[in-house]
Amino acid sequence: YHYLKTSNLSLVIPKIKNKYIVVSQKRVPINKINYEFPSGIVEKKETTLQSAYKELSEETGYKSRSKLSKIITFYTEPGRLTTKITGYYTKDLIKISKPEKGIKIHLFNQSDIFKLILKQKFNNSSHIAMFLYLIKNIKNL
């Protein structure tokens, strides 16, 4: 039986003025622009929370003024990978810089995100699962 030991991930679902911040960037493995939430690898000496703050700032140019709220942690593909993804949510944001080169930020409502998913432009299954969990289970969005 084969499986890969892979890094864990953090993801942030940020919301400002009743819109979710979504980033788009070219993803080499699929050779397409993909829409997704800010996310990244949790480095060896980081917690998932530290990684989430870093990814939010690097990918969007926004900083959360309050502690990020944890959504849930789950395995991304337990039959093949050891990767866990931990999601966080915030709606208390302040703009501090520009996003990283090659990343565009967008403000979408919930309906817009569902349309992107249906058009297969929002293609990361763990991001979709985290978003669905958030809107179904978290109060006061």
Could you describe each region identified by the protein language model?
Residues 1-2, 24, 126:
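Short linear motifs in exposed loops
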Residues 8-11, 21-26, 30-35:
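Short basic alpha-helical hairpin corresponding to helix-turn-helix/winged-helix-like nucleic-acid-binding
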Residues 17-19, 27, 92:
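Short, glycine/serine-rich, charged loops/turns that create anion-binding
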Residues 37-69, 88, 98-100, 109:
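The catalytic Nudix box helix
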Residues 76-96, 106:
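Active-site-adjacent beta-strand/loop module that shapes the phosphate/pyrophosphate-binding cleft
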